[in-house]
Amino acid sequence: MDNRKKLYGVVPPMITPFTEGGELDIPGLEALVDYLASEVDGLFICGSYGSGPLMSVEERKIVAETTLRRAAGKIPVVVHTGAASSRDAAELSAHAASRGAAAVSAVGPYYYHHNADGVLAFYRAMLAAVPRGFPVYVYHNPRFSGYEIDLGAMKKLADEGARGVKDATFDIMKFALYQRELGETGFDVVLGTESMWLSARALGAEAYIPG
């Protein structure tokens, strides 16, 4: 994905196959990527559906490398790099960028209660870990992070280089607010559910990550 372009179309959150023993199922992962590559417009990996938070950093790197290698030249891949620590998120983001990801995205830091400054510091660490201009998406999912990221903080992140937001608030009014206040500046507001697609499309949405 060109740094200036937005995500487009249907970008499903891909599951991560495991063996019965709990190990990564690499042949299954490769087969899944091969199947989806001709059916959708992009892939979102290692997110909630992809069991990202349940995997080690090394396992997540293996999933990213395998998916990116298999999808190369076919469809863009967005790698979810969210973690409880900014150190892990930065490491995973740098790795994904170096392996050919179209973008990275991360749910904000979780488990502990974070104030606005802590959330901003988390995403700044991600931005600092990737090449300048590389697409970094905020994954706004209050159900899992435990807090809302307010419009002021989102504007700061946009000003500092964040490429867009995956809005998983399931609140069409929140989506409309982001689209009105940030979408016209080039900030990519991506819908994080298929259930509101028609309304979001009318508001200017160009992509959704169903879930």
Annotate each predicted stretch with a short phrase:
Residues 2-146:
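Active-site beta->alpha loop and helix N-cap motifs at the rims of alpha/beta catalytic domains
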Residues 128-131, 142-211:
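Catalytic alpha/beta core domains of metabolic enzymes, predominantly
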Residues 1, 95-96, 156, 199:
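A general structural signal for stabilizing positions within well-ordered secondary structure
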